[in-house]
Amino acid sequence: IKGAMNILMTGDEKMLNTFIQDFHMKFMKLSPEEIAFPRSCNGIEKFSDNVKSRRRTANKLEERDSKKRKTKTLLGTLDGAKMTYGLFAPGAPIHVKGAILYNHLIEKNKLGNKYPYIQEGDKIKFINMKEPNIYQASAFSFPAKFPKELNLLGCIDYDEQFHKSFIQPLQFITNKINWRIDTSYGMQGTLEDFF
């Protein structure tokens, strides 16, 4: 951002776009730790659908037992209705969804001895994920070190990360001075390339 700010003050639109193209190529080679957004993680329990679903299930079971129903409830259902729950409750912030996913995958892959679980109030980093993905998540969070054992490197949305962390802050200024940012980052073909 500092380099781009210097160009905004002393250069022109073409210089800025050349700088952005060069930086885009460097950015795409950075590690997840280097490109992730820092955040403080609050609301893991509040937005974890597993906690909410356990409470709902307990309430339903109490209600069912109090009515003393004589019919059996099928496996995977509650009072005859199928119950499907995801990892996150509706309205969860993106970085909290990422933290819930991280904790779930660390537990599922038995990596708890190598990587710490994210707790309420922890400082974390989060990255945007390509969608759709097998976890139906838009982000993945981690405490300090990205767990490469989870094989999520291919799911990282570097373009979205670049846009949100670098282009959007620049556009706040370039829009005011009527400069256009070439979002093809030098990858757009020309009519000459066609022939």
Model-derived regions, located:
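DNA-dependent DNA polymerase catalytic subunits
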Residues: 1-195
